[in-house]
From Swiss-Prot:
GO terms for molecular function: GTP binding; GTPase activity; translation elongation factor activity. GO terms for biological process: ribosome disassembly. GO terms for cellular component: cytoplasm. This is Elongation factor G. It is found in: Cytoplasm. Catalyzes the GTP-dependent ribosomal translocation step during translation elongation. During this step, the ribosome changes from the pre-translocational (PRE) to the post-translocational (POST) state as the newly formed A-site-bound peptidyl-tRNA and P-site-bound deacylated tRNA move to the P and E sites, respectively. Catalyzes the coordinated movement of the two tRNA molecules, the mRNA and conformational changes in the ribosome. It comes from the Bacteria. Keywords: Cytoplasm, Elongation factor, GTP-binding, Nucleotide-binding, Protein biosynthesis. GTP binds at residues 17-24, 90-94, 144-147. Gene3D superfamilies: 3.30.230.10, 3.30.70.240, Elongation Factor G (Translational Gtpase), domain 3, P-loop containing nucleotide triphosphate hydrolases, Translation factors. Residues 8-291 form the tr-type G domain. It holds the Pfam family EFG_III. InterPro entries: EFG_II, EFG_III, EFG_III/V, EFG_IV, EFG_V, EFG_V-like, EFTu-like_2, G_TR_CS. It comes from Chlorobaculum tepidum (strain ATCC 49652 / DSM 12025 / NBRC 103806 / TLS).
Length: 704
């Protein structure tokens, strides 16, 4: 099957937003207008197509980034009349599902940032915006819910500029706001669009209403000045008062959007069917195709030499697996983005991350959770493969004769853990396998066994994250489990630098054991994890024993010296040592490495760390004092406060250990009128009195 659409007419986009900005409804409307849906599903009725997990339908929030494909032919603009393929990744807006947003942004060429015209820029919008900045994703902004009481387009534009540090340039302004929202002025064509009151999908083009002429002129000048600054020819025309064509404006707007220097802003009400078609035109006009994104960089798995691949079908096949999902009908699905080349169904691919070769059984293009078989997928496509057993999120799939490893995805470490116990013997048998499947899908979800108690512990990014995973155990895998109290994932590190000798000797006749290492341990900056450096000179320790020393150190780091928590952000340098020709072995050096590290860590001013969360609360003014007092009482540090959409907001940094059950407390404190968001910020040293209490607790547990 040949390529259906030329590569420069493909758009891989994400829709990113805060919860309740209307993301799922907007996606539904896109699918409806592009002919993919015959009936629209409303989130508040629990019928939306993109939200295909049971809990998503129940909770009205999107958890997994479902991928779907559709076609659109713009009516206006530089690409009018040309058919385009749009692949949409629907991303969740809840902060516990950061990993879903992160991995979708990695494979996108552009995004539609959705804002609620009433709420403006919410805390989660900032988080997602920062993630998009990290990956340099071009964006257009769509101010949704213009029909709601209290909607304010211009305040939202101002908030995008002030709170997100972006450069928003409206290319539309609304005709009426709130209940009187009737349409918009197109500032490029200088025409009014009035929607049919009964059916928002039909509209009439009109002259700009008299009372809006001045405002429209002002905002058009604002737009022209913004684009003229980026193009000398346009600037000259503008300064000389010459006419600038629609095509010229769109061309420079596109360049500026792709360069992430401008964010074109549109408005609408997806629920009322107003604005979605024009937003789709803007996706085609201003967001990148895989061709604009250009080459992708990677390296040779053997030589580490840099390799570059062009987004062309003729290039060798290279793709990134960005999501693993379990489908009730076909089993394990691997979602992947093709960066170069062609993949035929039934062919073999090399997983260059692991070095394993696997056969792709079938290739599916997903429409939400419905499937469409494809014989082949091409550069720029997003699809799902059936039959890949050992692929994990972030792995590279490629042509085995031309191997390449693409840049890996980096995921945050979990900050909260709970114990799970199966309710029955039958549940016990299925628990391990079910948890392993969930961990395959989600890299921020970890499963481990507590060696002291034998309990199974699951770790994740927040209470809601773990709650939903336990819920999935029950629904998808039919495993009933009792859940313990949430526990904080404390960590340990060191503050000083120490050199220490680790020695393991057993020599009492016959074959003995001998390993001696000298280690230097020192702190690394936060988030760097662990670094091992081999500085052995003159073969005082043979090369084959050095990996064993490293393994011994890493094993010792799992069980810290302050209170037995894992250690992090430490650099260890192996500077000297001794070996015995007969008695030395890998095991002896592994134990010596472990002894040396433990001894050094005890002397290097070890400290206990706790996860600190960034908390934002939006509350009516009358509860502000109570909310702030409560946060301070939780060892919180108030960072800032201000007004937001008729309410007050407070931002604070609070230890995670103090935030369990906060949603219930906040609800009762404010009669359910406040809401909050919380995300992991960093690890910070635990105050001495709390560290001592934790140590006693651990020691007490050990002596039981």
């Amino acid at each position: 099957m040949a390529r259906q659409v030329a590569l420069d007419r493909v758009r891989n986009i994400g829709i990113m937003a805060h919860i309740d900005a209307g993301k799922t409804t907007t996606t539904e409307r896109i699918l409806y207008y592009t002919g993919r849906l015959h009936k629209m599903g409303e989130v508040h009725e629990g019928g939306a197509t993109m939200d295909w997990m049971e809990q998503e339908k129940e909770r009205g929030i999107t958890i997994t980034s479902a991928a779907t494909t559709c076609f659109w032919t713009p009516k206006y603009g530089n690409y009018a009349g040309l058919n385009h393929r749009i692949n949409i990744i629907d991303t969740p807006g809840h902060v516990d599902f950061t990993v879903e947003v992160e991995r979708s942004l990695r494979v996108l060429d552009g995004a539609v940032a959705l804002f609620c015209a009433v709420g403006g820029v919410e805390p989660q919008s900032e988080t997602v915006w920062r993630q998009a900045n990290k990956y340099g994703v071009p964006r257009i902004a769509y101010v949704n819910k213009m029909d709601r009481v209290g909607a304010n387009f211009f305040e939202t534009v101002k908030a995008i500029r002030e709170r997100l540090g972006a450069n928003p340039v409206p290319i539309q302004i609304p005709i009426g706001q709130g209940e009187v929202f009737a349409g918009f002025v197109d500032l490029i064509r200088m025409k009014g669009i009035i929607y049919d009151k009964e059916d928002g999908s039909t509209y009439t083009e009109v002259e700009i209403p008299h009372d809006l002429e001045n405002e429209a002129r002002t905002w058009r000048i604002n737009m022209l000045e913004a684009v003229s600054e980026l193009d000398e020819t346009l600037l000259e025309k503008y300064l000389n008062g010459e006419d600038i064509t629609e095509e010229e404006i769109r061309t420079v707007l596109r360049q500026a959007t792709l360069g992430v220097t401008i964010v074109p802003v549109l408005c609408g009400s997806s629920f009322k069917n107003k604005g979605v078609q024009f937003m789709l035109d803007a996706v085609i006009d201003y967001l990148a195709s895989p061709v604009d994104d250009g080459e992708v960089e990677g390296h040779d798995p053997k030589t580490e030499e840099p390799i570059v691949r062009q987004p062309k079908d003729e290039e060798p096949f290279a793709a990134l697996a960005f999501k693993i999902a379990t489908d009730p009908f076909v089993g394990k699905l691997t979602f992947f983005r093709v960066y170069s080349g062609v993949l035929n169904a039934g062919s073999y691919v090399l997983n260059s991350t692991t070095g394993k070769k696997e056969r792709v059984g079938r290739v599916l293009q997903m429409h939400s959770n419905k499937r469409e078989e494809r014989d082949a997928v091409y550069a720029g496509d997003i699809a799902a493969a059936v039959g890949l057993k050992d692929v994990r999120t972030g792995d590279t799939l490629c042509d085995e004769s031309k191997p390449i490893v693409l840049e890996k995805m980096v995921f945050p470490e979990p900050v909260i853990e709970i114990a799970v116990e199966p309710k029955t013997k039958a549940d016990n048998d299925k628990l391990g396998m079910s948890l392993a499947k969930l961990a395959e899908e989600d890299p921020t979800f970890r499963v481990k066994t507590d060696e002291e108690t034998g309990q199974t512990l699951i770790a994740g990014m927040g209470e809601l994250h773990l709650e939903i995973l336990v819920d999935r155990l029950k629904r998808e895998f039919k495993v009933e489990a009792n859940v313990g109290q949430p526990q904080v994932a404390y960590r340990e590190t060191i503050r000083g630098t120490v050199e220490y000798e680790g020695k393991f000797v057993r020599q009492s006749g016959g074959k003995g054991q001998f390993g001696l290492v000298v280690l230097r341990v020192e702190p690394l900056e936060e988030g760097k994890g662990y670094e091992f450096v081999d500085e052995i000179k003159g073969g005082v320790i043979p090369k084959e024993y050095i990996p064993a020393v490293n393994a011994g150190i890493q094993e010792a780091m799992k069980d810290g010296v302050v209170a037995g928590f894992p250690m992090q952000d430490i650099k260890v340098t192996l500077i000297d040592g001794k070996y015995h020709e007969v008695d030395s072995s890998e095991m002896a050096f592994k134990i010596a490495g472990s002894i040396g590290f433990k001894g050094a860590a005890k002397k290097a001013n070890p400290v206990l760390l706790e996860p600190i969360m960034k908390v934002e609360v939006i509350t009516p003014e009358e509860y502000l004092g109570d909310v702030m007092g409560d946060l301070s009482g939780r060892r919180g540090h108030i960072e800032g406060m201000g007004q937001r959409a008729g309410a007050q907001f407070v931002s604070a940094k609070v230890p995670l250990s103090q935030m369990f059950g906060y949603s219930t407390d906040l609800r009762s404190m404010t009669q359910g009128r406040a809401n909050y968001s919380m995300e992991f910020e960093s690890y910070r040293e635990v105050p001495r009195n709390i560290a001592e209490a934790l140590q006693e607790k651990r020691v007490g547990k050990d002596s039981e």
